């Protein structure tokens, strides 16, 4: 039996996902499409479209609403069961999943990439994730990416523990897709559209970009495209490409024309946490995205992850430096990891800072000087770094 292709529609609230879903159903040309809807509010797609022809009647329950919330770990069991039920029932050529506007696409993709032994469900045997589509509102994206709002500020959070920012969510949705639809282009000027397209291309350089109004696209671009590859999608974000190239990723002349650029900041000295935190809090608003590994003097034994999207910025410890581990552990890891061994410094080991900065009209020289001023200087290098002012106050045990 041929595996059923699955298309996932992602995008922030109001971007046009539901309009796209209606467009797909209105123009399906004989395709038998099962729809899984996951939304915080009432299902608002035109159910008559599902009932109209192709055996997609409401009595067949081909239109499914999952429980309130976002498609995430909690609801993955529901999604697994529903997809399996639809495929085994038969009579469909394609599944389209409309994610809620506040969900990240990665958990959905993960659902189709592993076997759930507990439930006894193996979706990889009966269907394949075919296309990850993200819809962007051309008129709102720049405003929302620069907003300091959290989802809860707009009454859009899953629950009271959901502290995600709008900017982080938008970046997550853009960075993990293989088709990126810029919708509502009639609401902005040609120059604004050209610049937005280049910003999105910098954030997600491998996705197919489609510009449209009213989410009207050729269905061949979103159904049965065979575009999706989990490994490639996981490595397709612009910041990853830039880091992998060491800051020498190819930048098109058109991108540079609109002032979109990126560079990698890499140093073998630690940041003074207070000075670096001050810089993060006053980061220029033309920095759209920055992400990578940071070495902080006050936390000499751990590597920290910096992730900034628009006005949202987060830094936290993620792993121990190999250099902070026991000699036996170091020897074993260096023998197994050629990438770590190749970058090993006689004094600092694997400790380093390396992150990418993507933005508009970036002054690389000025930003680099500002960041260099945050590094531990010559007068501080031999001091007790633990005595430096610490804005984070993380409680982390030393590596063993």
Where in this protein do the model-derived segments appear?
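A short beta-strand structural signal in non-transmembrane regions
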Residues: 354-359
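C-terminal accessory "lid"/substrate-recognition subdomains
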Residues: 2, 42, 141, 150-353, ...
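Short, aromatic/basic amphipathic alpha-helical patches
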Residues: 48-53, 197-200, 369-372
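Nucleotide-state-sensitive switch-loop elements of NTP-binding domains
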Residues: 2-168
